[in-house]
């Protein structure tokens, strides 16, 4: 059944969000059939989106030119978050190998990080790259709590956020005052880092980025479900647009927060949205990994970063 214009599930909670709504576009389901969709990442050269189906141990790919969907990588090592570096190489957070890896043009795989101070990482979850070459990722225990998203195991290190230098091999822990580090992204000017915490804190943190270190960490926002009377929810994957707004996978789909920490809009979805990314040839299409499906909607802004 056709959806009316404007799509009633793209909701302005504040007039400031209306500028981002395109009146004659709708939320589209591009694919369905996964068990737990995660980690969407846009490849601008190939004009495709890659995302993870964690329990099925595969990565999927959607092509922009004809909408074709296929299995991209099987097995995937139970990958979760994905991104691309500034040389176009894919980076993946792998639950199965408890590591972050990079896929080379030759087909080889380079391990970016799998141990911290001699102990195995937990289950790297989400990942972003900085123009200085640094690779930032989160490492909660979600992927080793059972056998559904990889292999049940005891954690050897505390959940944390890390920065890896792929040239030197140096791995630095930058934050560990959390039991559930999850989504991560930079502000458009790379002066701030946002961290979605799905642990006990159930909040988004914001930090000042000081070279390779995080400073002045504080609560950015604690989300609830709009219209629920205050029922709490938590952001999972997060991305920033060129105006500094945070687009967060959070019930009832996606919530949009200003750089000042004010929620202004939401996108309602029929499935739980785990993660998002901007893509398309103009970076003005929001892709949403929603449980069993991949969704997309055009918005009147652009993603701040390449993937």
Predicted regions and their residues:
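A short loop-to-beta-strand structural motif that recurs across blades of beta-propeller domains
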Residues: 58-60, 99-101, 160-162, 203-205, ...
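A detector of repeated loop/turn-to-beta-strand junctions in beta-rich toroidal repeat architectures
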Residues: 56, 97, 151, 155-159, ...
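Blade/loop signatures of beta-propeller domains
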Residues: 1-26, 305-307
């Amino acid at each position: 059944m056709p959806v009316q214009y404007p799509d009633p599930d793209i909701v302005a909670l504040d007039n400031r969000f209306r500028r981002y709504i395109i009146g004659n576009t709708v939320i589209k389901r591009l694919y369905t059939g996964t068990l737990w969709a995660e980690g969407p990442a846009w490849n601008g050269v190939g004009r495709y989106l890659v995302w993870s189906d964690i329990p099925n141990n595969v990565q999927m790919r959607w092509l922009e030119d004809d909408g074709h969907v296929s299995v991209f990588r099987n097995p995937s090592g139970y990958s979760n978050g994905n991104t691309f570096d500034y040389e176009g190489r894919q980076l993946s957070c792998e639950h199965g190998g408890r590591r972050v890896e990079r896929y080379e043009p030759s087909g080889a795989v380079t391990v970016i990080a799998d141990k911290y101070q001699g102990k195995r990482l937990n289950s790297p979850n989400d990942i972003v790259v900085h123009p200085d070459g640094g690779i930032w990722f989160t490492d909660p225990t979600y992927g080793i709590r059972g056998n559904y998203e990889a292999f049940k195991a005891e954690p050897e290190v505390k959940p944390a956020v890390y920065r890896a230098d792929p040239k030197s091999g140096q791995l630095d822990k930058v934050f560990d005052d959390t039991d559930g580090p999850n989504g991560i992204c930079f502000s458009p000017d790379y002066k701030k880092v946002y961290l979605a915490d799905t642990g006990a804190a159930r909040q988004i943190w914001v930090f000042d980025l000081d070279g390779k270190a995080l400073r002045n960490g504080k609560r950015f926002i604690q989300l609830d479900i709009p219209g629920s009377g205050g029922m709490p929810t938590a952001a999972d994957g997060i991305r920033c647009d060129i105006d500094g707004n945070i687009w967060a996978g959070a019930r009832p789909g996606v919530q949009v927060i200003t750089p000042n920490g004010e929620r202004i809009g939401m996108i309602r979805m029929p499935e739980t949205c785990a993660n998002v990314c901007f893509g398309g040839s103009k970076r003005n299409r929001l892709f949403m990994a929603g449980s069993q499906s991949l969704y997309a909607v055009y918005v009147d802004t652009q993603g701040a970063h390449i993937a």
